[in-house]
Amino acid sequence: MTQAKLETEVSKYMSYVLRHAPEAAGLTLDAEGWVSFDELEKALTSKYDVSRADIIEIVENNPKNRFTIVDNRIRANQGHSVDVDLALTPVEPPAALYHGTSSANWHSIEREGLKKMQRHHVHLSADVETAKIVATRRKGEYLILRVDAARMFSEGHSFFVSDNGVWLAESVPVQYLSPDAGTP
C-alpha cells in the first residue's frame, strides 16, 4: 500500500471511530467527544503501520480539518452519530449558506426541509464552491441549495460553526431553501 493510500485509510478509520463507533477501536469518548491521543495512537498502531508522528501529520494535513488535538486529547470536529456535546456557541451566520446534495434528494427536501438524519446537525457551507465539493462526492447529478440564513436566524433558529469552519444547524425548514443558480 502506498503512503498516500495508508494515510487516507487511517484518516477514514479515525473519522469512523471518533464520529460513529469508538468501541470498534476500544475507545470511550468523553461527553464532548474527546479521547486520549495516547489511546487513539495505541488503537491505530495496533491496526496500521503508523507512528505517533504519522498520526499527527495525518491530522495536520487533513484537507477538511476533520480533527482537533488539544492537550494530548483528540476529537472529530463534527459529523458525529454518537451522543456528544461539542460545546458549540451559537453565532450569527452570513446572509446565505449553502448545502450540496444529490438531485435525487430534492423531492424529499422540498417537502421536509433539511434534516440532520443520523448526525447532530445539518452541515452547511459558507460558499457555493465548498457546497459543490460536498455534493460531487455523491454519485449522480448534484444540487446546491441556498439557505436564507439571515431570515432563519432572525426568526429564532440557531447556527454554530465547528472548529474546521463547517456551519451547523439543527435543521433547515423548507421555507428557507431554494435551489441555487450554481447548480448545473
Swiss-Prot record:
Superkingdom per UniProt: Bacteria
UniProt cross-references to Gene3D superfamilies, sorted A to Z: 3.20.170.30, RNA 2'-phosphotransferase, Tpt1/KptA family, N-terminal domain
Recorded GO MF terms: NAD+ poly-ADP-ribosyltransferase activity; tRNA 2'-phosphotransferase activity
Top-rank EC class of the record's enzyme: transferase
The entry's keywords: NAD, Transferase
Enzyme Commission number(s) from the entry: 2.7.1.-
GO biological process: tRNA splicing, via endonucleolytic cleavage and ligation
Presence of the UniProt keyword Transferase in the record: yes
The keyword Transferase belongs to this UniProt entry's keyword annotation: yes
Function: Removes the 2'-phosphate from RNA via an intermediate in which the phosphate is ADP-ribosylated by NAD followed by a presumed transesterification to release the RNA and generate ADP-ribose 1''-2''-cyclic phosphate (APPR>P). May function as an ADP-ribosylase.
Family: Belongs to the KptA/TPT1 family.
NCBIfam families found in the cross-reference section: PRK00819.1-2
Protein name: Probable RNA 2'-phosphotransferase
Species per Swiss-Prot/TrEMBL record: Rhizobium leguminosarum bv. trifolii (strain WSM2304)
